[in-house]
Amino acid sequence: MDRGAPSRERIAELAGGEPLLAVSDLRAGYGKMEILHGVDLMLAAGRSLCMIGPNGAGKSTVLHSIYGFTRITSGSVRIGGEDVTRLSPNEKLRRSGIAYVLQDNSSFPDMTVEENLWMGGYLLDQPWQAKEAAERVFEKYPRLANRRSQPARVLSGGERRLLEISRALVMEPRVLLVDEPSIGLEPRYIEMVFEMLVELQRGAGKAIVMVEQNAKKGLQFADVGYVLVAGSVARVGSGADLLQDPEIGRLYLGG
């Protein structure tokens, strides 16, 4: 693991191959307040990255900025070498293959599970495309298929999380941004959610960028870990290396 501000060469090395997602010297924030101060991030397809750090470090703001929810003052976001920095969130989802699973409960409680999945395809040209995508989800996740006609409000917290991630898959993204996937979940549902993410990364080749308050679980999952402090990347390393670092353990892992 690198100590001190990591070099771009080290960040590129940890990407795990040709970067699918490349964030370069990103400065961004909300209104007149700059939250991110020159963030670099790279990740190849089929790889995972978890950001940890203290509250207010800017972790979720990195996801917001990649997706287009912040005011970017300088730097760039590239997908497969194409500059997508100024694209709207809808354009990033439809054209560039970036999907975002929000931290807060984002399912529609009075819609059925099936209808929630259809909503994930709101940018598709034809309604039947979303319906076909929903059927593919049901084939892969029988737990949701068994609930397809029930309103989302009757789902457990873990099932809602599966639904939210599945809805993001309807547009067949290449990059999946996931904000706090374990928050508020019982341990058995945390395992279920992370099993799904592992399959999406290793089986479907998605690049997954995650913020996770359960730092130990996030680093166990991720190929790469970034530590953010005060809007900057302070440390980088493999997830395994960060887990073994005594200082990281003391500050973020309860060790």
Model-derived features: where do they sit?
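ABC-family P-loop ATPase nucleotide-binding domain
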Residues: M1-R27
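ABC-type ATPase nucleotide-binding domains, specifically the catalytic core motifs of the NBD
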Residues: G31, M111-E132, K140-P142, G237, ...
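The feature captures the beta-strand-to-loop junction immediately N-terminal to the Walker
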Residues: I52-P54
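Helix-to-loop junction immediately C-terminal to a conserved catalytic motif
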Residues: Y67
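ABC ATPase NBD coupling module
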Residues: R71, D83-A99, D104, P127-A134, ...
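Conserved ABC ATPase signature
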Residues: P151-L155
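ABC ATPase C-loop
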Residues: A168-L169
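Helical segment within the ABC ATPase nucleotide-binding domain
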Residues: E191-A204
